[in-house]
């Protein structure tokens, strides 16, 4: 059996009951993948392309990835933060860390796939989505994908357009944005426009699966 490795941050991470109703898209991805593949979700909260590697979180994948496996790589949300332990620069260190993951996959005859970050649900007071929420990281990832001849799926642009289509208020149901006393873990409510609830996680997967289905290298992983 082959493996699909997922590496990234909290938007992909497998959550526990303690953080319910927060759900990473990686938690529900198996619903769309056929039984010939197992999913190993290594994504961790708060990690960047830099800290994920330097904390040793990539070791399990690096030691086990093999011919026929896939490596889905999604970083960017935390790379922009100023903390020196996690920050990367889009066109230098960010690309260097992404290249490391890509090269590990390639040397083991696995397929690396670059995914840009899902767009933050940031609307202005007029209900207009804020532009350039993720700075130059998606552009830098796309540039690297072209250079390395790697599959690139622009989840940032796709999810931005989805948010525009849904609008400010309706899109709240996809995110950890809700009123008080709705969930036991968050009695005071939550106004989090980055992390997903189950509807959001499924929506992200549906959009990702649509892109995968159109790619002959990737669509072999999907359920018929």
Q: Where do the language-model regions lie?
A:
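Residue-level preference for alpha-helix termini and adjacent loops
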Residues: 11, 51, 193-195
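Alpha-helical cap/lid subdomain in secreted, periplasmic
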Residues: 56-202, 206-224
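Short, basic, glycine/proline-bearing loop/turn elements
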Residues: 9, 42-47, 86-87, 126
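Short, charged N-terminal helix-start/capping segments
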Residues: 2-7, 44-47, 130-142
